[in-house]
Amino acid sequence: MRTRAVELVLAGVLLFGLTVAGSALVAPDRSTAAVDDGSERATLVGSQGGGPGWHEHGSAYLLNGTDIEWREDSADSYFDVQRLSDGRVLAGFMDGGYEECGPYESPCAHTGIRLIDPDADGGAAVVEEYSFPVRSQSNSEIHDAEPLPGGGFAMTDMDHERIMIVEDGEVTWTWNASQLYDEPEDPTRTDWLHINDIDRVGEDRFLVSVRNANQLVIVERTDDGGSEVVEIINEDTEGSPDDSCTGNGQLRDTDGDE
């Protein structure tokens, strides 16, 4: 009986694990945030969309139960969304059809951040935008952005694999992942590190997701305007094999060890 009980427990644990894994595999590509304006709770959603490459018919919208209170769908894709203290919504986005393309052929895609006013005349509308051209819509987006106490926004950039601070439409600080990881010849041509999340965890300190390295890093903006990695979570130890991470081709070993 004892053996049978152990078998049942193990089977239950296995079933739970498979259920969680299955849920992760089929989860829709949406970012959600709870909104509480003092009267009732609602859910703010950023939808990347569908179609080839998951960059068609994206939108940002507010759900109250099953009712959509407002929707802004002028971009091919929206990503992380959050409501700001003034009621506007900060959203990472990507959209095609831009004429200002820098080194790339026109028309091209842009990625960046938008500020959406849900209460604009005529319905929710984009009232501010910061964006720049990217080579393609594949793994090149501003996936996450955070407002800063003194103004400006910190954000991730998957195209150049960096984090940066933008103030008044200008990049005022940057940390490039190539300062820590071995860079390919052209990061804009491959899904190298897939840096897709940033959180402010202290004054001038940011927690950054480096998905393809299976690591988190804490980056500090130094007083001289530079940057320093102060902690690596899940850091490789010297001499540790990377076979378990790279065997299925899902993660990359880019830390320069053997």
Task: Show which residues each predicted segment covers.
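Hydrophobic alpha-helical segments
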Residues: M1-E258
